[in-house]
């Protein structure tokens, strides 16, 4: 059963992603083949061409059309004889008014074009990290994850446009190229690492949003639907997959991945009824095989359900605000973003024994949940609870399991420019079978996670301190992490950030694999 023992590390990776079904959120799998590599260059070029070619042409066309129209109007008056001037003088004022109206209409039209074409926002910068705890491998054929592990220039661009009075659209994209791999022997890194971490270009949010009726909002396209009231541990927030390639290093606004959905919001007084249909089946971006956040020694086949009408995911939410406190009910039927392991066959090898063949599958789950948020003075008390049904495991195949997730937390904002947040979450596997403790399932009846976040601003809110900590287990005995960062706004549009990430190994195999992943990081960002 040597293969089973090799698999323990891999299972612990998914054991950790079970906590990411709490999904650590204070923090389209892209296999960049030749086509997507071409997309990497096309996306920035497309936006540049809009600026360079389209905008000047549109403005020039507007100005030329306006000038030609004005000349045509005035030319008729230039041809008239002087003896007719007095007779026509009464019409001159009206003509002037017509010209003024046309100029106003043209100016308004030109302004609307400018707003539609020039309403861009985005950011550009460079993100770096340095792994100081890990030594370079003695074997030069192995990947070197010591020293500079990231030197990543990036660029993101968002175009927002208003379409009439009740509709608007958004198109956003993001691209990066990591120079750190070229600074080392790139041939020692796995193909999965290079394809997923060296470069990436993707379209993110692409949607059309509007209100066909006063009480109804419609949103169609790639989007993010965030459910729940928690800041760092997620319970009912199950619709969007997440980017977990660098565990603990990704912020909330970046961790959720937009996917193709249709969302309807219907308003009834203080209530909102939300209905969601997810058309695109896509799962978490996990650390690639061979990466410093993936300790597994073997690759497994992942079975991804086809995006079809039959596999459409659904969600319903009833959200209300009552005298200052908020409550919501949630229901969803979806594929679990975290795969389970299925034993597809067992081969008997003489001298070794039974060798199983593993495969990653995604269970079809049904979730019912509730959230509550109550302000009280300087405190905000919040809670989430959900029951998930339909969970599958490798070692117990004769039944489906359910799990109950509960979260409680509080935010305190009584200090000036300061926020303190504490959250505590438990995942309880119902009708637990002791067989599930063995590999490859490696399940626990109860998983416990606690997080604390402290944020404070200084120097007229231009310097921002952010401290985040998480511990696994009742007393942190299974591991944890600490992240510290300090951001300074050099000017309105330019900021720099520096910090450190420390991992606590504990008794959890996955956190033990991160013991030498401690690093310092730096980012410079220009926003426009």
Predicted stretch roles:
Residues 59-168, 172, 180-181, 195, ...:
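N-terminal periplasmic/intermembrane-space "pro-region" immediately following the signal or transit peptide
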Residues 126, 153-161, 171, 205-210, ...:
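Residues on the lipid-exposed face of transmembrane beta-strands in outer-membrane beta-barrel proteins
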Residues 126-132, 175-179, 224-226, 268-270, ...:
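Transmembrane beta-strands of outer-membrane beta-barrel pores
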Residues 160, 165-294, 323, 503-505:
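Outer membrane beta-barrel
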Residues 162, 373-393, 397-471:
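Detector for outer-membrane/organellar transmembrane beta-barrel domains
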Residues 166-169, 215-218, 270-273, 324-327, ...:
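Repeated loop/turn-to-beta-strand initiation elements of outer-membrane beta-barrel proteins
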Residues 244, 502, 516-528:
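Outer-membrane beta-barrel "beta-signal"
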């Amino acid at each position: 059963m040597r293969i089973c023992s090799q698999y323990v590390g891999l299972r612990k990776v998914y054991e950790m992603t079970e906590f990411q079904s709490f999904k650590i959120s204070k923090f389209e799998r892209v296999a960049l083949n030749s086509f997507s590599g071409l997309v990497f260059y096309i996306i920035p070029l497309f936006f540049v061409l809009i600026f360079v070619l389209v905008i000047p042409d549109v403005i020039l066309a507007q100005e030329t059309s306006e000038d030609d129209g004005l000349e045509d109007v005035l030319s008729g008056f230039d041809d008239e004889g002087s003896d007719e001037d007095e007779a026509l003088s009464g019409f001159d004022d009206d003509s002037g008014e017509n010209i003024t109206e046309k100029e106003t209409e043209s100016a308004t039209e030109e302004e609307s074009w400018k707003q539609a074409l020039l309403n861009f926002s985005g950011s550009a910068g460079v993100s770096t990290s340095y792994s100081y705890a890990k030594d370079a491998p003695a074997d030069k054929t192995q990947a070197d994850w010591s020293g500079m592990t990231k030197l990543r220039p990036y660029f993101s661009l968002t175009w927002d446009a208003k379409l009439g009075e009740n509709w608007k659209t958004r198109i956003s994209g993001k691209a990066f190229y990591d120079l750190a791999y070229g600074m080392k022997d790139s041939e020692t890194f796995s193909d999965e690492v290079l394809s997923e971490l060296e470069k990436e270009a993707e379209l993110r949010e692409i949607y059309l949003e509007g209100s066909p009726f006063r009480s109804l909002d419609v949103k169609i396209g790639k989007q993010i639907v965030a459910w729940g009231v928690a800041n760092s541990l997620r319970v009912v927030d199950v619709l969007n997959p997440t980017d977990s390639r660098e565990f603990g290093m990704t912020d909330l606004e970046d961790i959720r991945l937009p996917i193709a959905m249709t969302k309807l919001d219907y308003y009834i007084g203080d209530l909102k009824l939300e209905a969601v249909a997810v058309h695109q089946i896509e799962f978490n971006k996990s650390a690639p095989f061979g990466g410093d956040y993936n300790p597994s020694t073997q690759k497994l086949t992942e079975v991804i359900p086809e995006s079809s009408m039959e596999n459409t995911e659904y969600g319903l939410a009833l959200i209300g605000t009552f005298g200052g406190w908020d409550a919501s009910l949630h229901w969803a039927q979806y594929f679990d973003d975290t795969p389970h392991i299925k034993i597809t066959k067992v081969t008997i090898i003489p001298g070794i024994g039974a060798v199983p063949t593993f495969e990653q599958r995604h269970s079809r789950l049904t979730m019912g949940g509730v959230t509550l948020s109550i302000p009280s003075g300087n405190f905000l008390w919040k809670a989430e609870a959900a029951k998930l049904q339909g969970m599958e495991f490798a070692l117990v195949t004769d039944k489906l399991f359910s799990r109950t997730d509960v979260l409680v937390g509080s935010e305190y904002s009584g200090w000036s420019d300061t926020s303190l947040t504490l959250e505590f979450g438990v995942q309880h596997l119902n009708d637990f079978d002791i067989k599930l403790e063995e590999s490859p399932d490696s399940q626990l009846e109860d998983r416990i996670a606690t997080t604390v976040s402290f944020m404070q601003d200084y120097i007229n809110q231009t310097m921002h301190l952010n401290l985040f900590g998480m511990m696994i287990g009742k007393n942190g005995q299974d591991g944890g992490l600490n992240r510290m960062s300090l951001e300074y706004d050099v000017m309105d549009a330019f900021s720099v950030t520096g910090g450190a990430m420390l991992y606590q190994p504990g008794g959890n195999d996955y956190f033990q694999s991160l013991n030498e992943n401690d690093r310092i990081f730096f980012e410079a960002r220009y926003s426009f």
